[in-house]
């Protein structure tokens, strides 16, 4: 039993129990220090999120609340998979009237139709197009200086767009009817071109593309054989998209059960794959089709191709995160952009299954053995082990125990390790085997047996590399048995007696974590009556400072100072906090420099050293103006009460940032500025610079225009296959991204195509290539593409309807989806504002939205309205505070209220103590996006 102690206090809000938050923050920081790869989560307490790289969030909108407006403890809501919420919402905001879908004026009728198509208002678009069919001249205006296009050309253009609209709204029969009329009109089109729009040249392109639309419509009505003929007719004119279309043909055959034909098409598609990942994806589909037909011999050959292709995957760029220039970026699977890693171990397992089904047991066993060696800590390795054991194939007993332990098959793991020790008592791995037994016993809840197994390691294997792990396991076991104080003593004893062990710093880290967690279990009412020598927080601080003193070069040292600093600040111990942050800056200058500077300033300010604090913030704002902490520092430099009202204060602060001298926001100014950039390195594929005589410098270079991926991607987007088109455009982007002469016109073309994520990425990277490297140091024209206002009519009207700041809504959309309408998260959230389907259904009910279905969440006109309504709802629920509203949008409104209550009105501390690393980064990034939107659009 441990004695109770006086609970933690905070001068910010009376009795403030910090334990739950700091324990999770410690754990997150510990996990970070153990995982130094590019996808590692940042240090939890004082993240230094570099901004403003375009980042797609992995978050999902929380379930629409319906419980009490004041929860007493955090709910089980998670940022990616919310499960609960408050039970009694405040009065819902009055449902706003639906926004009128009107494009920015002036616009021709055809431009209006294109706008309606872009926001998903297909019904309105079709009504407008049908009206134009009755009077085609209205589509181009009745009074023109140039000769009018022929009525046949105008009707053809309208019918083509009508077919696209019907396909987008899943009305293939109507699309087919429009295409039949389009084909009939083709017989009457003039041979010569015209200066009016659409030109005969455009109609000729429409005619070629109409074969693809016809194929799509035929497939939609079940006429698969005719559809395939139409697809192949299209490929005769557009061979650059053969790989994509062959897969579409395969899907067409599969829809009617023609698996053999589908397999042939998938083979063709794989032959056209441009990357190893794409080839593997297609071959995996092919293998599945062959397995379904029982053609196991062919399936084995395909798996061998997959395994061979996987070897080249490491040489390819990561198309998901490498564009961000920051290692802590984590992309969501935005449709059309996600590139999945190749998990070789799973293909080795599946190849083994195929070989076994084909009757080649030796080859099957060989593949399963390779799976065990490839990645023991994987499901595929465990499944491979099961296959080997079922066939009585010999397997190293130690490896068998490890794999069983990874798979939580604890009893088989114990059996394997015990047999290993019995058969090989002198093996160098015997100590590790005993530790494996102990871990399995802990998994089974067999505490006494686990303690005896750990003692075997500590007593009999002093030279085992696993000794440090055994010490940690012994301490963790003591905590699991209900004696956390004893566990902390074990951690400290280990760190003191074996300071050279690599795990010694981690032992002190875990001891500090345990001390903080201990406070969560105290009886607050009884705590004052118990004589406690040391408060848990003081105990934790002692561990953290000992860690930094004894192990200054350890991975945990900087994080320990950060945790100690934030904890001290939250407790009102500002001098102690200042000392910790000053040490962090001086001893670990590269660890968290911006966070340390900001919080040192906050600590000094709280001590009354206002001038010192402002000097720190001014220096930080000047050196890192576009990082989260740099933005906060700029805000705080003139604030009487720092840490508060970030959103209301942001506009005036950001608008004061000057633009480049003479910058009028024009494209011409931007292009003059671009001419000052240095020439690209000579070793780049700068075929983009081969513009022919007569071209302007910033036209799309011929090498790019003729690039098969660019041409094919543009074509697929124009014919309604957005996801496939974006995949190809992504390849072209990566090919020319480091060549400004190519990247700038590519950016413009991406923007015109509505490839929003790519245009944002191109603009951002173009700015990074410039000498300034800062968004605010680039021309406003480029800044507006890097931070766009896509769907402005909808965003502005819906924000006004629910009385929220439209720039905050733009910032949220930027973070959630990078303005990609079909974006989807792992949690199932969809669309521009990432609405979870269940939340969408409840919003639809509250708004009396007719004919709601999950598919409509991908339509901008629906999603923006729902997102704006929900953000306002959460804001009303979360004390009408914008920062708390954003937390509630990501992690659940119940959680947001509880967390904000404990730090209010300090928004900076609120964000710093968020227990979900994802939510903290989400807030930091949105606030930085908001800074840029306010700076660019409130001048």
Segment roles from a protein language model:
Residues 866-870:
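An active-site-proximal "capping" alpha-helix that borders the catalytic cofactor pocket
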Residues 22-31:
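Bacterial N-terminal signal peptides
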Residues 855-856, 878-885:
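Short, charged, surface-exposed loops that flank catalytic or proteolytic processing sites
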Residues 1-16:
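N-terminal secretory signal peptides that target proteins for export/translocation
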Residues 852-862:
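A short, structured beta-strand-centered segment in the mid-to-C-terminal lobe
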Residues 31, 35-815, 819-827, 833, ...:
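Acidic, polar-rich low-complexity tracts and alpha-helical solenoid repeat scaffolds
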Residues 913, 924, 929-939:
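Gram-negative outer-membrane assembly/targeting C-terminal domains
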């Amino acid at each position: 039993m441990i004695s109770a102690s006086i609970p933690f206090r905070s001068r910010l809000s009376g009795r403030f129990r910090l334990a739950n938050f700091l324990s999770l923050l410690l754990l997150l920081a510990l996990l970070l220090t153990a995982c130094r790869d590019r996808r590692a989560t940042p240090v939890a307490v004082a993240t230094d999120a570099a901004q403003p790289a375009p980042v797609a969030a992995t978050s999902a909108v929380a379930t629409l609340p319906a419980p009490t407006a004041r929860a007493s403890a955090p709910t089980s809501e998670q940022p990616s998979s919310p499960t609960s919420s408050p039970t009694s919402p405040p009065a819902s905001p009055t449902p706003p009237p639906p926004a009128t879908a009107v494009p920015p004026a002036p616009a021709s009728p055809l431009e209006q139709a294109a706008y309606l198509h872009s926001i998903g208002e297909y019904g309105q678009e079709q009504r407008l197009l049908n009206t134009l069919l009755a009077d085609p001249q209205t589509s181009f205006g009745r009074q023109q200086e140039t000769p009018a296009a022929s009525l046949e050309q105008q009707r053809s253009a309208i019918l083509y767009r009508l077919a696209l609209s019907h396909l987008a709204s899943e009305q293939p029969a109507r699309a087919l009817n429009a295409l039949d009329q389009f084909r009939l009109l083709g017989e009457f089109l003039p041979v010569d071109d015209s200066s009016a729009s659409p030109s005969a040249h455009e109609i000729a392109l429409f005619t070629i593309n109409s074969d693809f639309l016809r194929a799509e419509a035929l497939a939609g009505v079940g006429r698969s054989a005719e559809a395939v003929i139409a697809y192949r007719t299209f490929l005769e004119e557009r061979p650059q998209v053969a790989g994509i279309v062959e897969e579409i043909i395969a899907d067409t055959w599969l829809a009617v059960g023609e698996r053999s034909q589908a397999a042939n098409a998938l083979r063709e598609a794989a032959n056209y794959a441009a990357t190893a990942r794409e080839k593997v994806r297609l071959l995996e589909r092919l293998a599945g089709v062959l397995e379904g037909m029982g053609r196991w011999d062919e399936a084995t050959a395909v798996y061998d191709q997959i395994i061979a292709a996987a070897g080249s995957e490491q040489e390819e760029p990561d198309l998901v995160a490498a564009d961000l220039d920051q290692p802590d970026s984590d992309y969501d699977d935005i449709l059309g952009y996600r590139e999945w890693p190749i998990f070789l171990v799973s293909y080795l397992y599946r190849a083994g299954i195929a070989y076994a089904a084909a009757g080649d047991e030796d080859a099957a066993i060989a593949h399963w053995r390779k799976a065990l060696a490839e990645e023991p800590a994987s499901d595929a390795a465990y499944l491979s082990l099961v296959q080997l054991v079922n066939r009585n194939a010999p397997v190293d007993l130690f490896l068998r125990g490890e794999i069983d332990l990874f798979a939580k098959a604890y009893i088989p793991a114990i059996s394997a390790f015990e047999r290993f020790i019995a058969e090989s008592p002198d093996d160098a791995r015997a100590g590790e085997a005993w530790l494996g037994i102990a871990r399995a016993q802990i998994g089974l809840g067999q505490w006494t047996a686990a303690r005896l197994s750990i003692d075997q390691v500590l007593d009999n294997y002093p030279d085992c590399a696993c000794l440090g792990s055994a010490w940690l396991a012994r301490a963790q076991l003591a905590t699991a048995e209900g004696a956390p104080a004893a566990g902390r003593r074990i951690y400290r004893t280990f760190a003191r007696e074996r300071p050279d062990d690599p795990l010694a710093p981690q032992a002190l880290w875990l001891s500090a974590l345990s001390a903080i967690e201990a406070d969560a279990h105290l009886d607050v009412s009884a705590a004052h009556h118990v004589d406690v020598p040391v408060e848990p927080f003081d105990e934790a601080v002692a561990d953290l400072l000992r860690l930094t003193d004894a192990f200054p070069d350890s991975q945990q040292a900087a994080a320990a100072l950060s945790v100690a600093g934030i904890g001290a600040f939250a407790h009102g111990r500002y001098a102690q906090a200042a000392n910790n942050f000053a040490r962090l800056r001086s001893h670990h200058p590269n660890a968290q420099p911006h966070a340390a500077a900001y919080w040192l300033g906050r600590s000094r300010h709280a001590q009354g050293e206002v001038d010192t604090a402002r000097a720190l913030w001014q220096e930080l704002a000047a050196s890192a103006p576009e990082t989260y902490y740099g933005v906060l520092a700029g805000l705080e430099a003139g604030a009487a009460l720092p840490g508060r009202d970030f959103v209301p204060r942001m506009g005036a602060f950001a608008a004061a940032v000057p633009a480049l001298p003479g910058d009028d926001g024009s494209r011409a100014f931007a292009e003059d500025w671009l001419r000052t950039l240095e020439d690209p390195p000579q070793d780049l594929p700068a075929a983009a610079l081969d513009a022919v005589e007569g071209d302007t410098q910033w036209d799309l270079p011929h090498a790019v225009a003729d690039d098969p991926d660019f041409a094919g991607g543009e074509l697929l987007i124009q014919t309604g296959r957005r996801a496939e088109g974006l995949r190809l455009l992504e390849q072209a982007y990566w090919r020319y991204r480091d060549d400004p002469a190519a990247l700038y016109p590519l950016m413009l073309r991406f923007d015109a195509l509505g490839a929003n994520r790519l245009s944002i990425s191109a603009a951002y990277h173009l700015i990074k290539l410039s000498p300034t490297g800062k968004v605010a140091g680039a021309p406003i024209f480029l800044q507006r593409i890097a931070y766009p206002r896509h769907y402005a009519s909808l965003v502005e009207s819906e924000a006004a309807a629910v009385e929220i700041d439209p720039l905050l809504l733009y910032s949220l959309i930027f973070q959630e989806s990078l303005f990609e309408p079909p974006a989807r998260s792992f949690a199932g959230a969809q669309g521009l504002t990432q609405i979870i389907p269940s939340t969408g259904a409840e919003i639809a009910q509250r708004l009396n939205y007719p004919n709601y279905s999950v598919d409509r969440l991908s339509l901008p006109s629906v999603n923006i309205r729902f997102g704006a309504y929900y953000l306002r709802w959460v804001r009303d629920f979360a004390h009408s505070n914008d920062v708390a509203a954003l937390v509630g949008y990501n992690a659940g409104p119940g959680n947001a209220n509880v967390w904000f209550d404990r730090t209010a009105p300090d928004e900076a501390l609120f964000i710093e103590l968020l227990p979900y690393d994802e939510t903290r980064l989400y807030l930091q990034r949105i606030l930085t996006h908001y800074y840029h939107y306010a700076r660019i659009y409130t001048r």
